[in-house]
């Protein structure tokens, strides 16, 4: 492949600066969601809106993340990953500052949607470039370690957001997000390699439709992409719904709400760290299967505990922590195998994968909101368990071929 970066033993500072700056941008977009969620109670109060707008803010953000994925991946294949990625960072900076002008909750939510478009660039462009730039074992290790940095957002976001809202206006958060993205822009401008292989080809809607049709006809790819969406949805639903579950439902303080995020996202990071240690010694297939056990056990514990006692929020936290550890162990390898399940250019494949996931997240978070409003913690966690069962069923299809992910080279 052109512009292939050196393997792990020979990675220099310039090569490492690219993933580091990409993850800083990813961090800024993630904390743009996780830090504002505890502040959403203050936002809806300022705009005199109902608490049902709290998770809707995240729904709008993720809907934006689905909006342009279909175009950005193929576009970056043809005009280059670098210019598209850099444009995405600038877009995020501008929309973060524009939200300071919102006059009501509807305008705020619209701007959250526009901010969410920035998520499209991470998967469809940035991570496609990462996958194209590094060999498989190195790539999985880098992806897992990058995920740890990105996961500081949901770990620190609720704590910092809850503390911030007591001393500073919520608007200041968006200035912080824009500043972090600006730093990543200068790093990416300096260090991001150009890995696109179809530069100069004409982009037509007919060809685009043909490419996506070929990708979506690949049953193994679709199974993997849907599985990634379903297995991650309980975590996203928790991020969206937990301010209401913990602060409104359980009558705990915003500080206690922040503390309850620590075991869940700490377990997620622990799973990623274990993955990084095991990658060179175990096959991707075995790591996915290994992660499946805590995923299913954790979701079952959370569902059983809250069905028996709706206010068993500590058991729910424990179950979701076990589940999160499994995700940390399994997801990076599943992303890799899904992306390479299709021979189509990785910009298109990554975009298709991202769209399927964002569709599941956008619809799923709204369903989880209504599940909690109508059935409390029990129905919320039963919905999460259903997603785990769907993931398990899709994994049976995805890993049906015994050779899938069964070698260290891929």
UniProtKB/Swiss-Prot annotation:
Function text: Efflux pump driven by the proton motive force. Confers resistance to a broad spectrum of chemically unrelated drugs. Confers resistance to a diverse group of cationic or zwitterionic lipophilic compounds such as ethidium bromide, tetraphenylphosphonium, rhodamine, daunomycin, benzalkonium, rifampicin, tetracycline, puromycin, and to chemically unrelated, clinically important antibiotics such as chloramphenicol, erythromycin, and certain aminoglycosides and fluoroquinolones. Overexpression results in isopropyl-beta-D-thiogalactopyranoside (IPTG) exclusion and spectinomycin sensitivity.
Effect of residue 26 to L/N: Strong decrease in chloramphenicol efflux activity. Loss of ethidium bromide and TPP efflux activities
PANTHER family linked to this entry: MAJOR FACILITATOR SUPERFAMILY (PTHR23502), MULTIDRUG TRANSPORTER MDFA (PTHR23502:SF43)
Activity regulation info: Inhibited by CCCP.
Record's keyword terms, sorted: Antibiotic resistance, Cell inner membrane, Cell membrane, Membrane, Transmembrane, Transmembrane helix, Transport
Outcome when changing residue 26 to Q: Slight decrease in chloramphenicol efflux activity. Loss of ethidium bromide efflux activity
Bilayer disposition of the protein: Multi-pass membrane protein
Localization per Swiss-Prot or TrEMBL: Cell inner membrane
Protein name: Multidrug transporter MdfA
Membership in a protein family: Belongs to the major facilitator superfamily. MdfA family.
Known outcome of mutating residue 26 to T: Strong decrease in chloramphenicol efflux activity. Loss of ethidium bromide efflux activity
Effect of residue 26 to D: No change in ethidium bromide efflux activity
Residue intervals on the Periplasmic side: 33-53, 104-109, 166, 248-255, 309-314, 368-378
Quaternary organization: Monomer.
GO cellular component term of the entry, any: plasma membrane
Further comment: A negative charge at position 26 is required for efficient transport of positively charged substrates, but not for neutral compounds. This negative charge does not play an essential role in the multidrug transport mechanism. Has a sensitive conformational switch that can be triggered either by substrate binding or by attaching unrelated agents inside the pocket. Dissimilar substrates induce similar conformational changes.
Transmembrane region(s): 15-32, 54-72, 83-103, 110-130, 145-165, 167-187, 227-247, 256-276, 288-308, 315-335, 347-367, 379-399
Cytoplasmic side: 1-14, 73-82, 131-144, 188-226, 277-287, 336-346, 400-410
pH profile: Optimum pH is 6.5.
Gene3D superfamilies: Multidrug resistance protein D
GO biological process, one term: regulation of cellular pH
Molecular-function annotations in GO: potassium:proton antiporter activity; sodium:proton antiporter activity
């Amino acid at each position: 492949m052109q512009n292939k970066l050196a393997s792990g033993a020979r990675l220099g500072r310039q090569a490492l600066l690219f993933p580091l700056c990409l993850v800083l941008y990813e961090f800024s977009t993630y904390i743009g969601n996780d830090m504002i969620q505890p502040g959403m109670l203050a936002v809806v109060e300022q705009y005199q809106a109902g608490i049902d707008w709290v998770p809707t803010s995240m729904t709008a953000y993720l809907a934006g993340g689905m909006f342009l994925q279909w175009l950005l991946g193929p576009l970056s294949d043809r005009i280059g990953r670098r210019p598209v990625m850099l444009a995405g960072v600038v877009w995020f900076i501008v929309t973060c500052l524009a939200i300071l002008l919102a006059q009501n909750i509807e305008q705020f939510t619209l701007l959250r949607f526009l901010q969410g478009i920035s998520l499209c660039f991470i998967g469809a462009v940035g991570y496609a470039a990462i996958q194209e730039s590094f060999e498989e074992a190195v790539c999985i290790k880098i992806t897992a370690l990058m995920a740890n940095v990105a996961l500081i957002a949901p770990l620190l976001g609720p704590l910092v957001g809850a503390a911030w809202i007591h001393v500073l206006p919520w608007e200041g958060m968006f200035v912080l997000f824009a500043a972090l993205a600006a730093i990543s822009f200068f790093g990416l401008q300096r260090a991001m390699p150009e890995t696109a292989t179809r530069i100069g080809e004409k982009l037509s809607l007919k060809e685009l439709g043909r490419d996506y049709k070929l990708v979506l006809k690949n049953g193994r790819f679709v199974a993997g992409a849907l599985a990634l969406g379903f297995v991650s949805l309980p975590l996203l639903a928790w991020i969206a719904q937990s301010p209401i579950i913990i602060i409104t439902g359980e009558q705990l303080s915003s500080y206690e709400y922040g503390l309850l995020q620590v075991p869940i996202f700490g377990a997620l990071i622990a799973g990623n760290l274990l993955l990084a240690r095991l990658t060179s010694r175990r096959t991707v297939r075995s790591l996915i299967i290994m992660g499946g056990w805590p995923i299913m056990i954790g979701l079952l514990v959370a569902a059983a505990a809250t069905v028996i006692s709706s206010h068993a929020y500590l058991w729910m936290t424990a179950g979701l922590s076990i589940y999160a550890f499994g995700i940390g162990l399994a997801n990076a390898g599943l992303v890799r195998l899904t992306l390479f399940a299709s021979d189509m250019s990785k910009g298109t494949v990554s975009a298709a994968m991202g769209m399927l996931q964002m569709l599941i997240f956008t619809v799923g978070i709204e369903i989880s909101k209504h599940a909690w409003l109508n059935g409390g913690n029990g129905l919320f966690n039963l919905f999460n368990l259903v997603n785990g069962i769907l993931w398990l069923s899709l994994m049976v299809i995805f890993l049906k071929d015994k050779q899938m992910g069964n070698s260290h080279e891929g």
